[in-house]
Curated annotation (Swiss-Prot):
One GO BP annotation of this record: terpenoid biosynthetic process
CC annotations in GO: membrane
Alphabetical list of CDD domains matching this protein: CYP58-like (cd11062)
Top-tier EC class: oxidoreductase
Entry's transmembrane regions: 13-33
Location, primary (coarse class): membrane
Name of the protein described by the UniProt record: Cytochrome P450 monooxygenase tpcC
Pathway the protein acts in: Secondary metabolite biosynthesis; terpenoid biosynthesis
Gene name as annotated: tpcC
Annotated membrane topology: Single-pass membrane protein
UniProt KW Membrane keyword: yes
The EC number(s) this enzyme carries: 1.-.-.-
Binding site for heme: 457
Pfam families registered for this protein in UniProt: p450
Amino acid sequence: MAILSSALVTIDLPVTLVSLLVGSIFYFCYLTVYRLFLSPIAHFPGPKLAAWTYWYEFWYDVIAEPEYTFKIGRLHKIYGPVVRINPDEIHIADPDFYDTIYAGSGRKRDKWDWITRSFGVDESLIGTLKHDEHRVRRASLSPYFSKQSVRALQPLIDRNMAILLDRLREFAKSGSPLKLDDAYAALTNDIVEDYAFGRSDHRLEAPDFDPSFRDAMLQGGKAGHVLKHFTWLMDLLKKLPDSLLLKLSPAMGAYSQLQTSVKRQVAEIQHAHQMHTYDKTRRTIFHEILNSKLSDYDKSTDRLWQEGEVVVAAGTITTAWALGVSTYFVLATPDILRKLKTELEAAIPDPSQPLNLITLEALPFLTGVVQEGVRLSHAISHRLHRICPDETLIYQDNDNQREWRIPPGTPLSMTSNLVHHDERVFPDSHAFKPERWLDNARLERYLVSFGKGGRACLGINLAYAELYLTLAALFRVYGTEQVKGKDDVGTLQLFETSAADLVITSDTVVPVMPEDSKGLRVKVS
């Protein structure tokens, strides 16, 4: 009997291997035929290799550099405004079609799990796939990011801005170069953490402004390109301790440590809420969520830490980058600085008095500076995805006299970088020109750094408040050697920094400086 069993195993093993081989070949052939000829989007233009396999995107984002976002721009120059960029996805490059894809909450827009799963925050607002579930979760957070709520936050922003101005005076005394990109990340992080959790890590007070949170998020963005192709890897990494993960992958280790920190903060808030030991006079986002009518699951630690990570990350990185871009161009362009200081001096006669956000928002040139900073910082370097589950979208390609009918359920995307550098909308698009926004309200339609529609960035009002208040407070009392105001307390001079330091050279989801850049540095005097 044992001999017979051994013989059967000997016979079955080759048969099994052959069956697997034949099955694999059959599946490979079927997948090839389906993707290239039978898919509902098989007729859309684009490279056949991209239509056939996801390895095409993998090559540009993982093997070469995280640069598929730039390759997509080059593909549009070859194939036109509609391009199939992988087996399932259509990318559009037409600013006038943006509002159709990123429609308001009255039209259903889902997200694509192939993208959202790469961040490991599937239960957060940005990771919520279905339109209706997203709307419920968003409704629980929206009140805390309304214009009224954000204006009530001004004392918090002012306190942190005062700390930053104190730090500038320290650097003036020491003569050391100040890394403003780190300082701005510390500023925005301290503000959003305090609002979210009722406490902050006081990064503004750290000697080096403690850029660890920002750096961990950027490393997580790099890892995301790998993780979206290998979903099992995310599950494996979650099971490893941070100490081991740091050795295997410093990028993922730093990102995991960040998540551990956010989990701890959310757990502490939940414990204080259960024990009724939190300060009820302070209105913070996550204390209020626990008092909301959301389901018990939506209030669980497993979900709320993901929301916490997204709120803090989005509230830190994108606004800090926009501040950096704005500051560089203002300092590098004397005429812009002169016009800005003239406007600020007229609107703020006494710089020692608290700023008025409503007054600042009405200043046309300051608004132009803010809008150009937002436009050229892009906020998100990656394309934004949407799925229209129940409607066929029709794109009219007028240049080529072609109508494209995009089937329901097809992942669609556009990229802010391509919209903001469309020369038909923004002539001389790479130039920082605040005056392009003066008496030109139509341009606001094409400013898409924060997305649009029912899934637009929730923190847009907070971001704008920080931009207005920070730039006004800074340039009301600081000038340069070439441009000085009567009430200035010092000057800021760019130090070994050029426009090349602000060029986005890789896609880590959010913009990041070139690897050889030393940052946005200034000398304070």
